[in-house]
Design a protein with these regions (language model features):
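Amphipathic alpha-helical coiled-coil/heptad-repeat segments
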Residues: 90-95, 108-137
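Conserved aromatic/hydrophobic "specificity hotspots" at molecular recognition or selectivity sites
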Residues: 11, 69-74, 116, 128, ...
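A short glycine-rich beta-alpha junction/loop motif
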Residues: 46, 59-67, 74-77, 97-116
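Short Ser/Thr-interspersed hydrophobic loop/turn segments at strand-loop and sheet-helix junctions
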Residues: 2-11, 32-49, 62-66, 71, ...
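Sequence-specific dsDNA recognition surfaces
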Residues: 6-36, 56
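Conserved structured core elements
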Residues: 2, 27-31, 60, 86, ...
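Short amphipathic beta-strand starts and helix->beta connectors
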Residues: 53-55, 95-98
Length: 137
């Protein structure tokens, strides 16, 4: 399976139009995969979209227009919400190259400032966000 930026919607990957790649293309990009433990961030075209990988796409090949974010010791949902926050999105907007097709370089992603409270607090914040979101919907 091959995940495109067009498939990345609403902080997940849509499963209604799954794409596959040929064996020859797979051989060229077989090391560029993403797992359900990672997050994605789009880095070309639509820049700064962030989301989780559904189980059906575990170890799928990922477009070169998105990067996977691998992390340890951080609540995945907390990191996703941080990356989607106005605070981080404004940083992304400022460090996106504007020449030709807009692009967000990996080194710029590594330089993003992300608030990182203790892990227990991360889970508490995620719980509050989910509570608030359920009230609003």
């Amino acid at each position: 399976m091959y995940i495109r930026v067009a498939d990345m919607k609403e902080n997940t990957v849509k499963t209604d139009d799954i794409h596959y790649i040929s064996e020859s293309i797979y051989q060229k990009i077989k090391s560029y995969t993403i797992s359900t433990e990672d997050l994605y961030i789009t880095v070309a075209g639509t820049i700064g979209s962030v989301g989780e990988i559904p189980k059906v796409f575990d170890n799928a090949n990922l477009t070169e227009n998105a990067d996977k974010i691998v992390f340890r010791g951080i609540c995945k949902k907390f990191l996703m919400y941080c990356l989607l926050s106005n605070f981080v999105q404004s940083q992304i907007k400022k460090c996106t190259t504007k020449v030709g097709q807009p692009k967000l370089a990996i080194v710029r992603i590594e330089d993003l400032l992300i608030p990182l409270p203790p892990i227990k607090e991360q889970y508490r914040i995620v719980h509050k966000i989910k509570q608030t979101a359920s009230i609003m919907s």
